[in-house]
Amino acid sequence: KKGIEKLDKAIQKLLLKQDPELIIIETSGSCHPMPLIEYFKNHSQVELTGLFTLVDSLMLAHDYQYGESLIPKMRNNLVNGKRDTVNLLVEQIMFCSHLILTKGDRIEQDRLPHIASYINEINPHVSVHSVLFGKLEIESLFELEEYDYFKVAQLAKELKPVIERE
């Protein structure tokens, strides 16, 4: 809640002085995307064009068998009423419009499509890109369509009470 209040103050201050074409906001890796999505959905002066999630492909390889164990671990958490980093990671994947696999140079290249396939089981609408040595084409950020709130509306409705309790 305080983070959204700080963000709102910063954006209002920025809009008083400038009319930016694009604002890029980097959040903490432990930040749940839903409050940010709701903030922009209800904002009259700025729109959310993309929600990027960066996922460490080396971590997925080692901790989640290249993504294969993400859904089973999430199911287990749901059955047991447990919330941990698995929930956060899966929910970040579910809400994002673009996913960037970092450290793609640190795993076997033929494993990247496997990781992408498991990510697409969680979010079939997300475009998955791998970056090697941290190189991202910045121009791609300027070619985004508006974020599709409809795709995540039901998910947001179901998760809102859970997230508010955290």
Which residue ranges define each predicted feature?
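Short, well-ordered beta-strand core segments
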Residues: 51, 99-100
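C-terminal accessory "lid"/substrate-recognition subdomains
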Residues: 74-98, 104-166
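Nucleotide-state-sensitive switch-loop elements of NTP-binding domains
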Residues: 1-87
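Short glycine-centered, acidic/aromatic-flanked micro-motifs in structured strand/loop junctions
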Residues: 27, 102-103
